[in-house]
């Protein structure tokens, strides 16, 4: 056999997938008609410094290591993706918060600017008002100075005209007819009125200096100002300090006995005729006549004040105590609770309940809970007499068995408990800070309130009679308040 010859060729970069067919040798003389063939595969030349890559690992441990590394890389990539998503979400929320804060800052800055503008406006307004007040004050001071200067000028004119002798002579002439009341204001006004002269040399038909001087007197000016104040203030027409009605009593014993003296006094006062001043016509009011009428009315006022009785201060010194015969035992007055019961038509009908729905619910529920048909309560569950507790002191059994001595001892031992009205109890409970939360659990704490009088104390024959006012024990109210503290305490 002859070996096949290989043609020289350059080394291929890619390994040959198909083998080249061998060159058929020429048939020899010994083997006529026979052909031989064989495929040859040439591996690629490996790169320098690298191991040949094999797809199948040589051992099982290496295969497990590769799988573990691949799983670790996958988990790490998934964790990185998850963290990236969280960071993106946090950034979005942060941007939303920043936008909201920026909007709030803009709104607050706008409000601050508005408040500043309003403050500047009010400051300018205050300055303007202060300027107006200062101008009015200066004008008022100028008017007061002018008025005082005019008064001083008039006083100087009066002193120059020689009015001083007349003014000193008239009070001495009329001081005997006027009684002394001890009032400084009345004396000043009376002296001011008496200083008016009956005439002067400067009076004419159209102008009288005497009348003007009379109007400018201090007493007349003060009386005119007080009269203006009374007319401008209708709400203060009544005196602020009202006198005691006992002090306003009048003694009528000598009223009709002194009729002759009263008849003579007006004649003596009205005997001097009014001296006409000559400047008052028939249709116009005359100052002289008015002053004379006031002088006539002063003695009447003094006599009226002298007839007043002194107030009876010590009534117990003169009134003896009532005797047994003065008191009638057959007279029975209605109890005060029925007369003063505002809920006579039933619980929840008073004005306070009609104004507050919660108060109405409280009163009606409390009245329903104390009705005789309510569930029995107490330590024994209502097994005592009349459906009450066995420890009750006011049962009918104890009343029937105990004698008079037992009744007196039990009555003295059972002291009356302090009670509150239904309205006061509701007001006390409503002032608790957690009362609004307690209204949702009304059925839990409302039975803890003990009411008086108890329904079993009323006889069956008196059901048609209006019942007494509802009273609540103060101790039970305190217990409910302590229950509120425990129940709604912040933990």
From Swiss-Prot:
Upregulating conditions: Expression is repressed by iron. Expression is induced by the zinc cluster transcription factor acuM to stimulate expression of genes involved in both reductive iron assimilation and siderophore-mediated iron uptake.
Keyword terms: Nucleus, Transcription, Transcription regulation
Record field: compositional bias (Basic and acidic residues): 149-161
Region (Basic motif): 60-79
Biased composition (Low complexity): 397-413
Disruption phenotype: Causes decreased production of triacetylfusarinine C (TAFC) but not fusarinine C (FsC). Attenuates virulence in a murine model of invasive aspergillosis. Also increases zinc sensitivity.
GO terms of biological process kind: cellular response to iron ion starvation; ferricrocin biosynthetic process; N',N'',N'''-triacetylfusarinine C biosynthetic process
SUPFAM superfamilies registered for this protein in UniProt: Leucine zipper domain
Residue ranges of the region described as Leucine-zipper: 83-90
A Pfam family matched in the record: Hap4_Hap_bind
Cross-referenced InterPro entries: AP-1-like, bZIP, bZIP_sf, Hap4_TF_heteromerisation
Subcellular location: Nucleus
Annotated GO CC locations: RNA polymerase II transcription regulator complex
Similarity comment: family membership: Belongs to the bZIP family. YAP subfamily.
Protein name, entry field: bZIP transcription factor hapX
Source organism (scientific name): Aspergillus fumigatus (strain ATCC MYA-4609 / CBS 101355 / FGSC A1100 / Af293) (Neosartorya fumigata)
Phylogenetic classification of the source organism: Eukaryota, Fungi, Dikarya, Ascomycota, Pezizomycotina
């Amino acid at each position: 056999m002859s070996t096949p010859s290989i043609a020289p060729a350059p080394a291929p970069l890619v390994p040959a997938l198909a083998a080249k067919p061998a060159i058929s040798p020429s048939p020899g003389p010994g083997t006529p008609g026979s052909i031989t063939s064989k495929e040859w595969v040439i591996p690629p030349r490996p790169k320098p410094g690298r191991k040949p890559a094999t797809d199948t690992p040589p051992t099982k441990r290496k295969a497990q290591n590769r799988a573990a590394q691949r799983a670790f890389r996958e988990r790490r990539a998934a964790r990185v993706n998850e963290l990236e998503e969280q960071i993106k979400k946090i950034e979005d929320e942060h941007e939303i918060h920043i936008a909201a804060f920026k909007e709030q800052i803009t709104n607050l800055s706008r409000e601050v600017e508005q408040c500043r503008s309003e403050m500047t406006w009010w400051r300018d307004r205050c300055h303007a008002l202060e300027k107006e007040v200062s101008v009015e004050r200066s004008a008022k001071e100028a008017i007061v100075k002018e008025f005082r200067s005019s008064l001083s000028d008039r006083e100087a004119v009066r002193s120059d005209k020689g009015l001083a002798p007349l003014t000193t002579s008239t009070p001495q002439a009329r001081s005997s007819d006027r009684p002394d009341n001890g009032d400084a204001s009345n004396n000043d006004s009376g002296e001011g009125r008496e200083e008016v002269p009956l005439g002067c040399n400067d009076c004419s038909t159209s102008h009288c200096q005497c009348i003007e001087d009379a109007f400018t007197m201090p007493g007349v000016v003060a009386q005119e100002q007080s009269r203006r104040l009374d007319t401008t203030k209708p709400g203060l027409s009544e005196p602020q300090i009202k006198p005691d009605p006992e002090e306003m009593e009048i003694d009528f014993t000598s009223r009709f006995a002194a009729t002759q003296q009263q008849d003579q006094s007006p004649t003596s006062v009205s005997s001097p005729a009014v001296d006409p001043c000559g400047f008052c016509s028939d249709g116009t009011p005359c100052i002289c006549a008015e002053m004379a009428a006031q002088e006539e009315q002063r003695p009447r006022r003094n006599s009226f004040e002298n007839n007043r009785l002194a107030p009876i201060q010590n009534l117990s010194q003169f009134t003896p105590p009532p005797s047994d015969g003065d008191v009638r035992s057959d007279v029975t007055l209605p109890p005060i609770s029925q007369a003063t019961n505002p809920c006579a038509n039933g619980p929840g009908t008073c004005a306070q309940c009609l104004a507050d729905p919660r108060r109405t619910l409280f009163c009606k529920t409390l009245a329903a809970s104390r009705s005789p048909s309510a569930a029995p309560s107490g330590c024994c569950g209502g097994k005592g007499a009349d459906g009450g507790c066995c420890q009750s002191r006011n049962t009918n059994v104890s009343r029937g068995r105990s004698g008079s001595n037992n009744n007196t001892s039990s009555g003295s031992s059972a002291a009356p408990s302090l009670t509150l009205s239904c309205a006061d109890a509701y007001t006390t409970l409503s002032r608790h800070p957690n009362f609004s939360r307690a209204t949702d659990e009304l059925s839990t704490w409302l039975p803890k309130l003990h009411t008086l009088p108890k329904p079993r104390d009323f006889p069956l024959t008196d059901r048609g009679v209006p019942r007494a006012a509802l009273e609540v024990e103060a101790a039970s109210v305190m217990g409910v308040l302590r229950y509120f503290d425990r129940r709604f305490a912040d933990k």
